[in-house]
């Protein structure tokens, strides 16, 4: 499969893949979704051929996002999202908890 992307579109695709993999795997240890790691590595490995070598680092033969990439604002975007949804999730969970307690009182 071939996809024609501009440099800017490719950079956005890297961000999308990184964020998706972060959400799926950042809290996992031994039970990672390795197929997503593989896709991320395939995409980031294309950086070297496309003038974006500073975005990658190679460790034990595997390509990973570099510290420069990770420090470039991507984690701030993830944190902004987490901040935006945290209170919604908390409110919903507390409401479910409280409704459960109220329902138990009437049963």
Question: Which role does the model predict for each range below?
Answer:
Residues 1-4, 15-107:
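Positively charged, low-complexity terminal tracts
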């Amino acid at each position: 499969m071939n996809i024609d992307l501009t440099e800017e579109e490719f950079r956005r695709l890297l961000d999308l893949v990184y964020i998706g993999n972060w959400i799926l795997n950042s809290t996992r240890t031994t039970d990672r979704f390795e197929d997503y790691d593989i896709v991320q590595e395939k995409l980031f490995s294309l950086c070297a051929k496309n003038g974006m070598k500073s975005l990658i680092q190679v460790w034990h033969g595997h390509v990973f996002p570099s510290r420069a990439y990770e420090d470039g604002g991507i984690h701030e975007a993830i944190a902004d999202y987490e901040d935006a949804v945290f209170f919604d999730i908390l409110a919903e969970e507390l409401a479910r908890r409280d409704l459960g307690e109220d329902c138990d009182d009437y049963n």
